[in-house]
Amino acid sequence: MKRVLLLSVLIMFAALQLAAQNINGKIQDSTNAAIPGLRIYLSGTQKHAITDANGNFTLRNVKPGSYKLIATGVGYNTVEKEVSIENNDIRLDLNMSTSNVGLGEVVVTAGRNRETIGTVPSSITIISGKQLQEQSAITTDINQLLGLNVPGLTLGTNTATKKGETLRGRSMLIMIDGIPQSTPLRNGDKDMRSIDISVIERVEVIKGATAIYGNGADGGIINFITKKANKDKQFSGATDVSTSGSLTNAANSMGGRVSQNFSGTINKFDYVVSGTYEQTGVYKDAKGQVIAPFQSLAQNENINAFGKVGYNINENQRIELMYNYYRTMQNATYVNSGGKFGESPIIGVLGTSPGAKQGTPYNHNAYLNYSNKRIFRNTSLDVNLYYQDFYTIFEYSDYYEGGGNSAITSHKKGLRVNLNTTFNISPNLNGDLTYGVDVLNDVTEQPLVDGRKFVPKMDMKNYAPYAQLKAYIFKDFLLKAGARYENVSLDIPDFTTIKFGNYAGGVHVQGGNLPYDALTFNAGLRYTKFQYFNPFVSFSQSFSLYDLGRTLRLAKDVAGGASVKGSIQTDAIITNNYEVGFSSNIGKFNATGAYYVSTSNLGTSLVDLNGVATPERAPERIQGYEFTAGYQFLPNLSVSASYAHVEGKKDGTSGKVYLPGSRISPDKGTLNVNYSPLKEKLDVGVYYVYSGSRKRFALNPKTNDWDLGAGPVSSFSLVNLYTAYHFNKATTIRLGVDNLFNADYYPVMAQSRVTTDSYIKGSGARFNLGLNYRF
């Protein structure tokens, strides 16, 4: 009897061993990049899995036999593979091709985890490395480049700031590898020019209100993703030199640029090191006249130093360190002269401006990141420590009593702990949960260079736990839902306001601690079954302490004394975004579309009160739509187009009134054609942009002038040209022309009269001739 029992136990263990085989694998695209979020099935069974952030999957406890493994996902061509299971685990690595680059593109910003665009129920624009490489041959101004490529984003101002630029009519949060660059406590509009384009691998733009990264993303997020190491070589590099200048009047307009990059992987180490130096010349308009130096891109010295090193501890663990230094300073030999809004532009004449030089003396960014793909079963961990130290100086102005330059300093220290757990309950319910906590200390102030305190030091401490669920329901419905709890403590010292413009100043304000608590939500649903029609609907909220510094510096004297807690309106803004949209892929044709509504009970518009720009906290409603389309006519010929419309109103004393031009931009349309007439030798790109008109306001009867942001905007069109000739795989010569047909125009913000001194023409035709050598 004992022998029978022993034999039975042995047979049972043997059977269990036979029934416990696993299929392990990894799925990559044609560039060997991991593809997350793909669904893996064994036909005829209930076995299923989802690839994790690194493209890995495991099908557990598969009985011996022959099966068909199916890998599928939005934006990729389905792969079917015959597999046979015997007595051992097997490994099956696959490569999948994209059926639509737009849907298959991997994004990390939207959900703080690697996922494809086709699995995100919101509007996303990605500017790829190829686009950046091509269009930076026309202009290295990232501000202008984004305006030409992102529907819903205001066209660039042709200056060193993004004043008046919005994403879907609201402020946006700018980041570098997730490190916030924006200064929402005192918005200086210098966050877009915070890094050189040479070290950006791609740009991810998440549209619509979101709180996933905290304060300031009422219109969305723009995240600059920095370059990664070359994993195929121990040592590689690229040298890029170029010269640029005006085609309307070359005198004093010539500039130069040199950039050097080294990269490679040595055993478990990988590295990227880069340095860039650029000197721009004088900018001229279409008639050859010198453009006014006010916040100009002309005569700027730009320096960028970048380094990133990584170490793979083992197959699951990695540590990575990044640092970037950016500096841009203007060495102007011209000063502003003349000009009258609506009649003649402000121009540049030889002279020396009093006060300090304008520009950004430094912007330091660094992070230390630890990642573990499997901290415990089905769960990955990312821990990120980051730091930013930013200092920028504005132009000299007699706006301040006795004259002076104001500056903004911002010091940020942060910690992010992010976990992701995948789950596979059944073929009809699987997905992942991302959760963690953000800790941020942001210290921002706006002094004058001479030491006077224009805006006092604001010391914000932010603690925010969050959770984000992504689940496939009945295979084809993708549900995303999440929440974030903002716990903010803002300390402001006692201060006395200074005189500027028509504001008398001299108001003593009692400081204090301002606490904020807010719970924000998001939810979205996407139907992923059909490539030709992939619709989504979503709701999301953002949390913002918009430009609190501007409010503080305008404190009014009241009975009993002014205080940050009592007499100054410092309420936070909660913005709600409602959106419905779709993506489509039919053979060589692809398209996207979205309609959105954005509301807030408190506004962020500026109004002119006695010559002083003052925040107006009125309820707002913004709505708009966006469309994109592309067609691959030939392997070497593609065409893409986009169109965006946005409009908004706020509550006024006599009903609804339109939002100013500093918030709402005219309609924008683009048409891009890329053609390679000589295979692997010659590339040509033609990029057209149309900016429409917006004339919503009348002259102020009291001043017989246009209020700030109320100027009538007329339409204009611009065409840019890119050409590149590849002598071989290592050497390329490029020629880019900005404003090819030398259009004579005023940028949108100049026409809107966003500021009294911004009636400045856009640049005339400019060339950029460069040589790139890779080794």
Model-predicted segments: where are they?
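Short, acidic, small-residue-rich periplasmic hinge/interaction motif at the N-terminus
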Residues: 28, 33, 39-43, 72-76, ...
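A beta-strand signature from Gram-negative outer-membrane beta-barrel systems
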Residues: 197-238, 774
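Extracytoplasmic beta-strand/coil segments of soluble accessory domains associated
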Residues: 143-183, 201
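Face-selective signature of the C-terminal outer-membrane beta-barrel domain
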Residues: 3, 312-327, 359-503, 510-511, ...
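Membrane-embedded beta-barrel scaffold of Gram-negative outer-membrane proteins
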Residues: 378-398, 526-528, 534-544, 550-553, ...
